[in-house]
C-alpha cells in the first residue's frame, strides 16, 4: 500500500522498444518511471496511476551525443528531471551526461572518467557516480555532479563494477558487484567524503538490484557463484 492506494503494475510492456532492450537504465519512482538507453534509442515512460506504457517520441537535442543507443549507463532523478550517465556505444566507453526535462534531452558537462557498468544515485542537482569499467581497467574513481559540473571525490575502497548504490550523495551504501578477482560481498558506507567498510552482504553477487537507504537497504536478485 502506497499513498493510500494499492499499486497495480498492469498494462502491456512495449515490444521491440527500450524496455526490452539489453543494457538500459531506469529512473523515477515506483508508479512513474522512465526507461532509456540499451540497444534501442527510444525513451519509454510508465504511469502507474493509469497503468499505461507510452513511447516518448520527443526530439533529442544534440543528436551527436544521444541519438544513438548506449548500454550499461546509469540514471538518477525523476521522469521529468533525469540524468543519463556514461555507458558504452560501439565499443567506446563514454563520459557523457545527458539531461531529460520531461520533453527533450540535452547534453551537459561530461564526467572526468569515462565509464560503463558503474553505479549512480541521487538527483539531477546532486548525483554520485562511482566505480565501473574504463577503457583500461575497473576503476575506484568517485565523482559528484552539482547540476552543472562534475567534481572528483575520495576514491571508493575497491575497484568495482556492477555494484549497487543506496541512499543519496554523501550518505550512500555501495554493495557487492564484481572486481578483478570475481563477484564480491563487500559493502561500504559513505559519510560526507569518507568511505567506511561495513558488513558484507550474504552472498557474492553481481547484476543485482537494490532499494532503500544507506542504513536500511535491500538487495534483489543478481548472479552469484554461490547458488542463485
Regions found by a protein language model. Name each.
Residues 1-228:
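Kelch-like beta-propeller repeat domains
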Amino acid at each position: 500500500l502506497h499513498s493510500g492506494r494499492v499499486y497495480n503494475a498492469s498494462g502491456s510492456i512495449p515490444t521491440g522498444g527500450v524496455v526490452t532492450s539489453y543494457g538500459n537504465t531506469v529512473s523515477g519512482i515506483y508508479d512513474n518511471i522512465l526507461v532509456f538507453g540499451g540497444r534501442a534509442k527510444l525513451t519509454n515512460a510508465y504511469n502507474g496511476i493509469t497503468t499505461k506504457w507510452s513511447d516518448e517520441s520527443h526530439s533529442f537535442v544534440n543528436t551527436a551525443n544521444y541519438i544513438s543507443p548506449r548500454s550499461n549507463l546509469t540514471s538518477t532523478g525523476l521522469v521529468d528531471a533525469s540524468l543519463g550517465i556514461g555507458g558504452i556505444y560501439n565499443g567506446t566507453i563514454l563520459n557523457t551526461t545527458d539531461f531529460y526535462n520531461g520533453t527533450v534531452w540535452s547534453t551537459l558537462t561530461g564526467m572526468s572518467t569515462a565509464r560503463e557498468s558503474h553505479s549512480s544515485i541521487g538527483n539531477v542537482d546532486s548525483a554520485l557516480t562511482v566505480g565501473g569499467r574504463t577503457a583500461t581497467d575497473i576503476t575506484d574513481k568517485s565523482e559528484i555532479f552539482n547540476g552543472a559540473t562534475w567534481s572528483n571525490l575520495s576514491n571508493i575502497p575497491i575497484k568495482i563494477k556492477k555494484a549497487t548504490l543506496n541512499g543519496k550523495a554523501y550518505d550512500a551504501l555501495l554493495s557487492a558487484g564484481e572486481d578483478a578477482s570475481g563477484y564480491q560481498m563487500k559493502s561500504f558506507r559513505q559519510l560526507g567524503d569518507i568511505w567506511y567498510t561495513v558488513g558484507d552482504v550474504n552472498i557474492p553477487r553481481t547484476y543485482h538490484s537494490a532499494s532503500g537507504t544507506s542504513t536500511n537497504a535491500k538487495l534483489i536478485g543478481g548472479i552469484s557463484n554461490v547458488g542463485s
